[in-house]
């Protein structure tokens, strides 16, 4: 059980080594886990000398990211095949001799390699890193074609006892009621592809993470979200 989360925001000026907002957390084992807000749904995690990238893309919304300037990945996780989540060029730039690529079934087909995880699968990446693939899909009328049930993944990462939920592209699906004990959650909020702000609030109230990072939000106005989530530390970073 996590009894305490310590976090600090580090801002680094554009043009220096790291121009991205960072949040640092202490794990129960006394190590540090750092999140870098790259762009849209792309997240970089650093932990105990390991580099983990979630849905890295080289271009999104007018932003360009040069992954050749970043360390090679130990692990790359891809939620699904849409272009704002799956980018072959980004994967190639980040791939080194020991990189492990974890994807949903469709992305493995498109890329030609990768360790496949379907909803419900679990994978031990290291002694202190476990991943569970969870459902991510649309439920609203007129949206189900964007992310059909059973195709895409969200991921729950357990890193040295710290539990992180990366939701992927999803709405506030019933399966969220089964997601317990989350320390840090990344929930999407843009229309028509993921959640409305109201759905985001509902999902956060269901999951009850200690810390919530809205992401994948485009031009969505999130100014009223934090006030509706008493007891949850809502942090809005520059993903767009």
Feature map (PLM): residue ranges:
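Pre-active-site segment of Zn-dependent metallo-hydrolases
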Residues: 20-30, 38, 42-81, 88-92, ...
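Active-site neighborhood of phospho(di)ester-bond hydrolases with catalytic His/Asp-centered motifs
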Residues: 54-56, 73-84, 101-105, 165-168, ...
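Metallo-beta-lactamase
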Residues: 17-30, 38, 103-162, 235-240
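Active-site-proximal loop/helix segments of hydrolase catalytic cores
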Residues: 138-206, 218
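Bacterial N-terminal signal peptides
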Residues: 2-12
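Active-site environment of divalent metal-dependent phosphoester hydrolases
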Residues: 59-62, 82-86, 108-110, 121-124, ...
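Binuclear metal-ion centers of metallo-dependent hydrolases, dominated by the metallo-beta-lactamase
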Residues: 113-125, 129, 201, 205-240
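Active-site HxH/HxHxD metal-binding segment of metal-dependent hydrolases
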Residues: 64-123
